[in-house]
């Protein structure tokens, strides 16, 4: 018989202006609540009095008490302490200056609200600073909806690693676990948290950081994001007044990142590009004195008279290692497909009100033929090497060039198994190669199968909703396979779409969990049942194995 876990309650008294910091391990889950009438904040979100606030394993955060307060915690973590050294006063001063700009903009005395870029080295707490500033703006009661721009693909604010995003939260963002630092995106089930439906638009880099190899792809993605935000501000006056906060990758601290061969002396080119794209007026540098000086001397910064402000790194910022980051990435991808984890028994059984969380999701696994799902890669680095060209010739390729992935190739070359794919919307005008007769026949067959309402799921036989329809079916037989083989290598190398689709806003994500080379089919995990919204996907370097 399994031992019943007991819950130990501990009261902690906090001095005015102090923080209670904690670092949860893999087997630690806690819940906390405030017992005093004075407010207590977690990342500038006020805790609801007397309500239990669950926090999941691996989370590292802090509670801040502006006045003396008492909190109650279940099962104290192994690593926790109180500190009177806090950066909250500096963050509050920044917030007040930005709030003044918003109010002046609302009165017509300013063109728009603050547009802030946050920079710093790895593990400096950039996302936490951004979350605090967003929550401070949302907690004013003025109805602001600031934009949260996630340009750090290694620490995505809403979705999965490798993605860039724009979200517009309208309520304070909670801190429950690692997956949604800036709120969860809309799911297929009704959300029961006040911040459960944060409007989110996403773009796919497919890598954990910008590099000199993917710099051109990065520039185009940032331009598309800035264009989308500009369109939002034109239609939504409140969004324009509220301003935006832009989280950046740690790679932005490297001066030579993105430097082009024709201008080798240029420095911080991707930083300057983002400043121009989003029309940034304030740069916050966390702890890095040299970076603060370098940015202050940039010609673009001086010509635009931007405010470059340096704030100290919080003493509670934890230096994460590669294992910590990998754990966070796995948790983020799993949460995208399965939803938030259930409450541990020792927390869900607590007496009293509980801050509610989202429901778990039920992803669907199904098969889809290779010929039906077009998998592409973006970037010149995915093309054939120059050594493969005829003697004396050289290649001139677009940095946004699309390369079609041949799933029948060697595994170490194809690299599709357990890869996360981003689904992109393709319009008729995007096609540059006419659809073959076999593809048209297969689409007709798919529609027919979907009408029959049959679906094949892992371990569950056939169910309604997904449809054998993603192009599978016994009717293909050997003739279909022979036809695919007869078409030869040209079909696999041929990219029938314009390269612009590779940097387009994505519709969602799927994972290839198995590849059947005999049946020439993928097994795909999708977050929702039914037909895929598109059969064109962009592959990157992000992998995830569903081991739970």
Swiss-Prot record:
Residues 479-494 have a biased composition (Acidic residues). This is mRNA cleavage and polyadenylation factor CLP1. Belongs to the Clp1 family. Clp1 subfamily. Required for endonucleolytic cleavage during polyadenylation-dependent pre-mRNA 3'-end formation. It is found in: Nucleus. Keywords: ATP-binding, mRNA processing, Nucleotide-binding, Nucleus. One of its GO terms (molecular function) is ATP hydrolysis activity. HAMAP family: Clp1. ATP binds at residues 19, 60, 123-128. PANTHER family: CLEAVAGE/POLYADENYLATION FACTOR IA SUBUNIT CLP1P, POLYRIBONUCLEOTIDE 5'-HYDROXYL-KINASE CLP1. The keyword Nucleus applies. Component of a pre-mRNA cleavage factor complex. Interacts directly with PCF11. GO terms for cellular component: mRNA cleavage factor complex; nucleus. InterPro entries: AAA+_ATPase, Clp1, Clp1/Grc3, Clp1_C, Clp1_C_sf, Clp1_N, Clp1_N_sf, CLP1_P. It comes from Cryptococcus neoformans var. neoformans serotype D (strain JEC21 / ATCC MYA-565). Residues 437-500 are annotated as: Disordered. GO terms for biological process: mRNA 3'-end processing; tRNA splicing, via endonucleolytic cleavage and ligation. Pfam families: Clp1 (PF06807), CLP1_N (PF16573), CLP1_P (PF16575). It comes from the Eukaryota. Its main location: nucleus. Residues 437-478 have a biased composition (Basic and acidic residues).
